[in-house]
Amino acid sequence: MKTFSQKPAEVTKKWVLIDAEGLVVGRLATIVANRLRGKHKPTFTPHVDDGDNVIIINADKVVFTGKKYQDKTYYWHTGYAGGIKERTARQILEGRFPERVVEKAVERMIPRGPLGRRQMKNLRVYAGSEHPHSAQNPEKVDIAALNKKNARG
């Protein structure tokens, strides 16, 4: 029996809607990263964008376990000498773009490279409960029901 290899023309993508309210960030991100890569499908092929389109709503209502809400620090560099910057998870979630916490968690679980960048374009994250993709008829996935550790509160 030959090893199956998915061809890009044969890929079928679904639209998936996930409500992130009360979900643990890391557990949500691993499930979303696997969906974006297509690892949940039997047709998974490492070099083909076989994943689904994922919509995440209520990204501002995700939770951290332990003291990570106050203590977890995100770092980035401006490119200038001495230009290291840092913010805590709390500052980002209470700031202008709280959806970046979920975006960065998923982005850092996807392989870096051209295929990873293409797969990240299939992710849409919204801080509120509204999204403009109702025409795609996304299938709702209940992450909290998969495992009791996935949700808090």
Curated annotation (Swiss-Prot):
This protein is one of the early assembly proteins of the 50S ribosomal subunit, although it is not seen to bind rRNA by itself. It is important during the early stages of 50S assembly. GO terms for biological process: negative regulation of translation; translation. Keywords: Ribonucleoprotein, Ribosomal protein. It comes from the Bacteria. GO terms for molecular function: mRNA binding; structural constituent of ribosome. This is Large ribosomal subunit protein uL13. SUPFAM superfamilies: Ribosomal protein L13. Part of the 50S ribosomal subunit. Signal peptide: none annotated. It comes from Chelativorans sp. (strain BNC1). Belongs to the universal ribosomal protein uL13 family. Coiled coil: none annotated. GO terms for cellular component: cytosolic large ribosomal subunit.
